[in-house]
Amino acid sequence: MVGQASPRGRPGNVRRVKDGFDSRGMAALSSGHLATDLAQGSLPALLPFLEAKFDLSYTMVGALILVATFSSSIIQPAFGLWSDVRGALWLLPVGVSLAGIGIAFASIAPSYGLVIVGVLFSGLGVAAYHPEGSKFASYVSGSKRASGMSLFSVGGNIGFALGPLVASFFVITLGMGLDGGVFVALPGLLVASMLLFAIPHLASFAPAQMEVRAAAAADQWGGTLMLLAIVGLRSLAHMGLFTFIPLYEISRGNGAAYGTRVLALFLFAGALGTLVGGPLADRIGRRKVLLGSFIVSPPLIATYVLVGGTVGLVALFFAGAAVIGTFSVSLVMSQEYLPGRVGVASGLSIGLAIGLGGIAALSLGAVADAVDLETALLCTALGPLVCIALTLLLPAPRYRRPAGPEPAPAAAI
């Protein structure tokens, strides 16, 4: 087909769609996101068993999350830059495979040091997948990018929520212990095979070079830096709760299985919030959605920690929807602030969220060791509080990219 992008994802001359998004491309990208984040999301469910096996302190538990988050975050902008300059659709199947294989290795590692190695490689797989995946999710979304990105993001949300349940099924329900963690790799390997066949179709959505150059002139680094500060502070709540909910429920006298179910509730609520947040942002504006979520999050978190019981679980559900549900909104905003560097914007937005979340996990682990887990969880509410002021200062984006390109006819792919 004349003008079609190469399978490597190089920009080409392609036709435009009007308003909709390509369901075939989105299904492939969201499935890969689900499998990648399922592997990453399984780690907290394994932490109580790793803690018991290697007699870990809370700080050492937090260090595992730090390794996972740093390895999956620091290198993301580099992958995004590679994507913007040369195209790197091959990162999609490679990343999702490595994410699962790393966790599988960590679950059967004979020492704490080798657990760290497995977690490290899993994080690199996560880092490889996200910039390219979110970049092409934007391309296949048409003009409703927040809505489209919410569908891509909800794949990750569901993966995070399924991760603890899948790991617990093999580790606890089937009584396999940590050896059951090897099965976490299976979804990623299956989805990687599907992504290999989807690459030519996805490549047809890459924008023309002329459009990329025009968009680069509108890059807003000031707005980007302010948004990244918001993303980092939001991670204090997101990753802090994500890491310590299971351990907090155990400290309350509940079992490990119950703690895993509470974590799944938090994450599934985030998936629902994502599905609502994207379309709502397209309708009423990105900043209004961010601001509303940051206003309601602190009291909801405090209610979960201080009240507990059914009321606490309901509060945690809505906290998950508010905190996690704005992820797709901030991701689209980062791409709108850097329209000529969509891969870099995606890598910075996702990478910083993960990386600072790891620092938050380690810091909150130290607070839990020095004081208690309740105090550490209450500290997670501070991030959204600061985000309220920063959100009010966010500028409007100067550039709006045209609706994404139309895919080639099936016979030409």
Residue ranges and their predicted role:
Residues 41, 69-77, 161, 267-275, ...:
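Residue-level signature of mid-helix packing/kink "hotspots" within the transmembrane helices
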Residues 43-44, 222-271:
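Extracytoplasmic gate region of multi-pass secondary transporters
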Residues 55, 87, 108-113, 142, ...:
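Helix-breaking motifs and short loop linkers at transmembrane-helix boundaries and internal kinks
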Residues 74-113:
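Conserved MFS/SLC helix-loop-helix module at the cytosolic interface between two early adjacent transmembrane helices
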Residues 90-104, 288-303:
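Structural signature of the two symmetry-related core transmembrane helices
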Residues 118-155:
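Cytoplasmic helix-loop-helix junction between adjacent transmembrane helices
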Residues 152-200:
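Helix-loop-helix hairpin linking two adjacent transmembrane segments in secondary transporters
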Residues 185-209, 388-395:
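C-terminal membrane-cytosol helix-exit motif in multi-pass small-molecule transporters
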